[in-house]
Curated annotation (Swiss-Prot):
Residues 402-422, 500-587, 604-633, 673-706, 942-968 are annotated as: Disordered. Expressed in brain, kidney, liver and testis. Induction: Down-regulated during neuronal differentiation, probably by NMDA receptor. This is Little elongation complex subunit 2. The modification Phosphothreonine is found at T589. GO terms for biological process: positive regulation of transcription by RNA polymerase III; snRNA transcription by RNA polymerase II; snRNA transcription by RNA polymerase III. It is found in: Nucleus. It comes from Mus musculus (Mouse).
Length: 988
């Protein structure tokens, strides 16, 4: 009996392989994780609970509720902010203490999002300087921590290959539906051309995609939901939700809706004639090419068509469709495709609004290229005649020795050494047309000869000769002629600038009013010249620099009608002046004809014509013309006084004071008219006025901007034309927005959409006025939620940048999703200022040059179907063309290349993304832990360490991760499983 019992019982086997504590089942850590006893922190919370806190609860409600221990309730209360367990133990402690980390976390939460010019920074300067100093030291440890995370990702490479069954099923269905869409394109292609992405054109830094017009808006958009009761939020769809969202087949059809077969786009192309029509996804793909790696692989179908135009030859249009599915796709990208669907459903409200009511673009960014910044416009003030020291109502014909001597006393000692006193130039219209204005140039000194000038009007006398040429008779007539020339010149300048300020009608009215010439002889003893020093009056808002004798010439009228009183004297004076110097009449310091162009319309509504340099042939043939426009005059600086007034050039001052109103032109070329004002030489830098008030009223913006609108390239009838939405086909779900952009000399028709809409104040000043604005939410799947928030990649930044180009009024959000739990743990809003700082990491000028080169290359293609192909990590671009029934062995089979699901790239490197140390998660704030830093060294024993949220460092038998840094001061005891375990089985 006993023997049978002993035979049935199993025998004890003591030959157990020693595990040396590596896989010990009953360890202190397992005991703490699975123990039902409350921790010290939970006991502390229970002890501090107010007495009688829950006495008001009725007995019936207590009986109906399940029995839950107080310790469990405390665990639930504290468990939301427990410090997460790292994937790999930390190799060392932080160089900062717990107190220092807590201080920096508080400063980071206060100043991380504030600009340095904010009021908070100004009132707390010392605290802000402390934050900057601590940030400099923290960044040193951040670099070491990021290297630790990169090595941790290599040890945990299986984390990046994780894909749930639900996500795998959805992505397979979607990708197969996209593969079916590929079959609608031609099957065989032959290599047509190979080119570089960058091209061989000169690199242009100032380039941008600029909005010309929003052509058509169709459909509606749902409102966005950005506030949630608690975070994180589980991204899980119920059966009812699955029935309301679109299927993978429907999503694939929307993704590959070709613009070449869009009837709405065809109508718009036939009306506006853009060179290129493309989708927003194609635009993003062409912009998302970042050198020098160019790691993005893509294929884009292109269709080149010729459309008929009434009354003209056919026009070529290039249709760029959405890119085809990728040949290789990482698990991170598959995860993002899957989580994008539930994220859009959770952040969407049931209400929607028509897209036509959405403010998609900012009006203040649609400034023309010739418009000035607001700062320059505010600091320049229009001066009135009351603010000037000059008396324009005085009769200068009664002055003595007019044009011979200068008797005005100088204001400053510097002006006493000048050979002639400067004269103030007025650029504004004088209210009284009969008043005699001051000439824009002072009479020259007696020692300086003045070359003659051609008359301005048929009744004007010619300018007299200089004192050196006074041997000719009728000196009083010459003085009278100079007087009349100066009066008529200033009167014409008054009319010139009043035409700019008053419009075409004002110019016409003042041109019709003529002045009678002076008939009396002006005694030379009473002629005086009005002078003024070269002192700059900053309080009056205008620079009063010295001027020289500037005489207006007319190229069209010479001789017979120029001086009815003494034409011989005028001719003699001209010959004497020219023979004395032996050089022709020049203008300014560069011997160029200076043309005063006010960009105003002449009396008949036409644009003003530019004058030319006077010559002998013009003087002989232009005597028959009796009328001319104001804009045909040209102010000529006399060559003999060039060496004296080289420093004080009145024409240069006019150019700088009236930057765009008075445009200099290049030297006259016999073959080409003087129409290019950009080639004229500018005045020397020494003559630039120091005061900011001398700025032009409409200077051309020179700073590059991707959001700046140029001059309208559309005709006026197309700019004001409003499309009838009833003539177009609206989408069944979602919306379509058709916009016309310009890229240098190319017109682009872009079909885009608005993802979501939000209601917010129209501006900071108009907070009571609320409008609807577009919103774009980017899903971002992250694998390092236990350490912090991952930074935005180049592709994600390019996506935000592309959306900001399409809709400048768009708001941006990033939905941070934990890849392991499928929870939305953070919905971050990116402000416009913050986005501009982030976009500084992109080489925007390089991306624009790549886009322009590709589009220029497409414009050179002939009619047909093409395929743009770019391989990963390749700087070249392949252009394939459809085979016309000829299939060779080198032909590219598009259908065969996309016959199966995209594979996973076989790369040895892990798709690791660095963290952004400026983002604080709730556990960072609660525990006072600086993001992207090692844990601080505990100051107390293990019992107190758990109260602070961390356990005492215990001896770790696992191999630590290498740091690859210069630091070798690793602690003896490693941090073990900080925070809550992943598979914690504690009974709640």
């Amino acid at each position: 009996m006993s023997s049978s019992i002993t035979m049935s019982e199993p025998r004890l086997n003591w030959d157990v392989t020693p595990k040396n504590g590596l896989k010990a089942f009953f360890s202190p850590e397992n005991y703490k994780d699975h123990s039902m006893a409350p921790s010290l922190k939970e006991l502390y919370i229970l002890s501090n609970r107010r007495i009688g806190e829950n006495l008001s609860v009725s007995a019936s409600s207590v009986e109906n509720e399940p029995a839950v221990s107080s310790a469990t309730q405390a665990k639930e209360k504290v468990g939301m902010i427990l410090l997460p367990k790292p994937r790999v133990p930390y190799p060392r402690f932080s160089r900062f203490s717990q107190r220092e980390q807590r201080t920096y976390v508080d400063l980071l939460a206060k100043y991380a999002k504030l600009p340095s010019s904010s009021k908070t920074v100004g009132t707390n300067t010392n605290e802000y300087l402390q934050y900057l100093d601590m940030k400099k030291h923290v960044n040193e440890e951040v670099n070491e921590f990021l290297k630790f995370l990169q090595n941790s990702a290599k040890k945990c490479a299986q984390d990046y290959n994780m894909l749930s069954d639900e996500a795998r099923l959805f992505t397979e269905q979607l990708l197969r539906a996209c593969i079916e869409q590929v079959k609608k394109y031609p099957e065989f292609y032959t290599l047509h051309e190979v080119t570089s992405l960058m091209g061989f054109f000169p690199f242009k830094t100032e380039m941008g995609l600029k909005l010309e017009k929003t052509l058509l808006v169709l459909g509606s958009a749902k409102f966005v939901k950005t506030a949630f009761p608690s975070m994180p939020v589980k991204l899980q769809l119920s059966k009812e939700d699955m029935s309301s969202i679109e299927t993978p087949q429907q999503k694939a059809e929307v993704m590959h809706c070709d613009i070449s077969k869009d009837p709405n786009a065809e109508k718009l192309v036939s009306r506006y004639h853009p060179q290129i029509a493309l989708t927003s996804q194609a635009l993003f793909t062409l912009l998302n090419n970042h050198g020098p790696s160019y790691k993005e692989q893509w294929e884009i179908p292109v269709c080149v068509e010729m459309i008929a135009v009434e009354g003209s030859k056919p026009v070529k249009v290039i249709y760029i469709n959405s890119p085809l599915p990728r040949k290789q796709m990482t698990m991170r990208e598959r995860n993002q495709i899957f989580h994008e669907v539930p994220l859009k459903h959770i952040i969407s409200k049931n209400t929607s609004v028509p897209v036509s009511a959405v403010f998609m673009d900012k009006p203040e960014e649609y400034t023309s290229e010739v418009d000035m910044p607001t700062e320059a416009g505010e600091c320049r003030k229009i001066e009135t005649l009351e603010n000037l020291d000059m008396d324009f109502d005085g009769d200068v014909t009664e002055l003595e020795t007019f044009g011979v001597t200068t008797t005005s006393p100088p204001r400053s000692p510097s002006s006493e050494s000048d050979s002639s006193a400067p004269l103030m130039t007025d650029v504004h219209a004088v209210p009284k047309i009969a008043a005699v204005p001051l000439a824009p140039a002072t009479p020259v000194a007696p020692t300086m000869p003045v070359a003659p000038a051609t008359p301005v009007t048929p009744t004007m006398p010619m300018a007299p000769a200089t004192p050196e040429a006074s041997a000719t008779p009728n000196i009083t007539d010459d003085s009278r002629s100079l007087c009349q020339i100066l009066m008529k010149q200033l009167q014409k300048e008054k009319q010139l600038f009043s035409g700019v300020e008053g419009g075409p009608e004002g110019c016409k009215n003042k041109d019709d009013q003529g002045l009678e010439p002076c008939g009396e002889e002006v005694p030379s003893a009473n002629a005086k010249s009005l002078t003024q020093d070269n002192e700059v009056h900053r309080t009056e808002g205008i620079s009063k620099e010295s001027d020289v004798g500037v005489l207006c010439t007319n190229d069209e009228r010479q001789g017979g009608q120029g001086n009815a009183n003494n034409p011989n004297n005028t001719a003699t004076a001209s010959e004497a002046a020219e023979s004395e110097k032996g050089i022709p009449c020049g203008s300014d310091t560069d011997e160029d004809c200076l043309i005063i162009d006010t960009e105003s319309r002449s009396c008949d509504g036409k644009t003003a014509d530019l004058g030319s340099r006077p010559n002998s042939s013009a003087q002989a043939s232009a005597g028959n013309q009796a009328t001319t426009t104001v804009s045909e005059e040209s102010c000529v600086l006399k060559k003999p006084i060039k060496r004296v007034y080289k420093k004080f050039d009145p024409v240069g001052e006019i150019l700088k004071m009236q930057d765009e109103l008075l445009k200099p032109v290049s030297r006259k070329v016999p073959e080409l008219p003087l129409t290019n004002s950009e080639e004229s030489k500018q005045p020397p830098a020494s003559e630039q006025p120091s005061a900011a008030l001398d700025a032009a009223p409409w200077p051309k913006s020179s700073w590059p901007s991707a959001f700046q609108k140029p001059k309208g390239r559309l005709p006026y009838e197309l700019q004001d034309y409003v499309e009838d939405t009833s003539e177009y086909i609206a989408p069944q779900e979602g919306n379509f927005v058709y916009k016309l952009f310009s890229l240098q000399d190319l017109l682009l028709l872009v079909r885009c959409s608005i993802q979501r809409v939000e209601t917010r104040p129209r501006s900071k000043k108009r907070k009571k006025i609320r409008r609807q604005f577009p919103v774009y939410v980017l899903p971002k799947v992250e694998y390092q939620g236990c350490y912090g928030v991952e930074a935005l990649t180049e592709s994600e930044l390019c996506r935000f940048w592309t959306e900001s180009l399409l809709h400048s009024n768009c708001s941006f959000y990033v939905g941070h999703i934990d890849a392991f739990t499928s929870k939305l743990f953070m919905l971050e809003e990116i402000a416009s200022e913050e986005l501009k700082e982030k976009l500084a990491a992109l080489k925007i000028s390089s991306l624009f040059n790549i886009l322009q080169h590709i589009l220029k290359k497409l414009c050179s293609l002939q009619e047909g179907s093409y395929l743009l192909s770019h391989a990963a990590e390749d700087s070249s671009l392949l252009i394939y063309k459809t085979s016309d029934g000829k299939v060779t062995r080198t032909a590219y089979n598009l259908h065969k290349a996309h016959c199966d699901l995209p594979g996973v790239p076989s790369s040895l490197s892990v798709p690791w993304v660095p963290l952004d140390p400026s983002y604080l998660l709730p556990y960072h704030i609660h525990h006072g832990r600086v993001p992207c830093t090692f844990p601080p060294k505990p100051l107390r024993p293990a019992a107190q360490a758990k109260v602070g949220g961390t356990r005492m460092p215990t001896r770790n038998h696992r191999n630590p991760v290498s740091m690859e840094t210069k630091s070798s001061c690793l602690p003896v005891q490693q941090v073990e499983n900080e925070g809550v375990a992943r598979n914690k089985r504690k009974i709640m």
